[in-house]
Amino acid sequence: MKTLRVVLVGLMWATVAHAGNLPPVQTVFVILLENHVWSDFSGGTNASFINGTLLPQASHCEQYYNPPGLHPSEPNYLWLEAGTNFGILDDNDPATNHQNTANHLAAQLDNAGISWKTYQEDIGGDVVPLTSINGYTPRHNPFVYFDDMTGTNNPNDAHGLAHIRPYPELAGDLLNNCVARYNFITPNLCDDGHDACTPQNNAVQQTDDWLASEVPKILTSAAYSNNGALFITWDEGEGSDGPIGMILVSPLARGGGYFNGIYCTHSSFLRTMQEIFGVSPWLGDAANATDLSDLFMPLAISSPGRTANGAFCLDITGVVPGLTNFVEASTNLVTWNVISTNWSSSNSFSIVDNTATNHDWQFYRVRKAW
């Protein structure tokens, strides 16, 4: 009897540094929320959108934490951007805590020619927002703490004004399909769950209501549909390191309510961003972190069996819609022949290998053309 051996080789972004095991995400959206452990939201009656709508279609982490002992907010936002808090353990404004370094994600994106923006709720957009106004606070906006992003605390800096924009502009950018590849979103102090505000006077419900209103705008956009990814997380646990929430919604995610118990931190998020965009070197503790690749759908080959004439049926899952996949076969793991070239509009496809009837051993792999 002929025996099938399946070998999977995932050739993902082979020309880009640090690609890891991640699919080719085109556009990233990040929503940063405030000061709640995951149990405040998971299964809670005040978070009906998260539990009833988001989680059933998402992947999420059950063991995601802020870095050990790192509090309050500002150090965690800095960590998400740079993999370190630069020794900062307070929430002071950039006038005190600004950093003269290019060792952070936005600078790497700039150097690589990769577009990015941060959308901050309650800013005016006429100046770089270096101090608090309305429900906006700088400590929830890591970019204003880096001199190369603000011209060293210059409220009129052109680079800062171009990249740090009022949140309402996101809707128009989504509609016109002109969003950047990396989009960092900070709601105001009511909508992010930091404060209890009227009329709900319930921080968890406020956040859930805001997400219910705003997330659909992202998920119905062309940028999201074209291999986009939305990450929703929190800065820190209130009174603890967590676990806090990390939710991924993406056409490329495992989805369907998948969750894992892998220990991850903000360093994992940063490493994942560096892998997605192929920028280096590793920033701070990202060098030591496990990435979030398990939340994405893995490439896999399986066989439901043979046809009546002895051919092998192959099911390939975890492919990226809209890209070309080459299924190759070998009898010796040295010489590989393409047996199928497939462009799939979904995350899976099936083929039949009629050549398998001629061999005692047959190995398979899938190559993806980026």
Predicted regions and their residues:
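Positively charged n-region of N-terminal signal peptides that target proteins for export
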Residues: 1-5
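Bacterial N-terminal signal peptides
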Residues: 6-15
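Sterically constrained small-residue positions within well-ordered secondary structures
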Residues: 10, 21, 71, 176, ...
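Short, threonine-centered small-residue motifs that mark membrane-proximal processing/anchoring sites
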Residues: 17-19, 327
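N-terminal pro-sequences and low-complexity stem/linker regions of secreted or lumenal proteins
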Residues: 19-300
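Short, composition-biased motifs enriched in small/polar/acidic residues
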Residues: 298-370
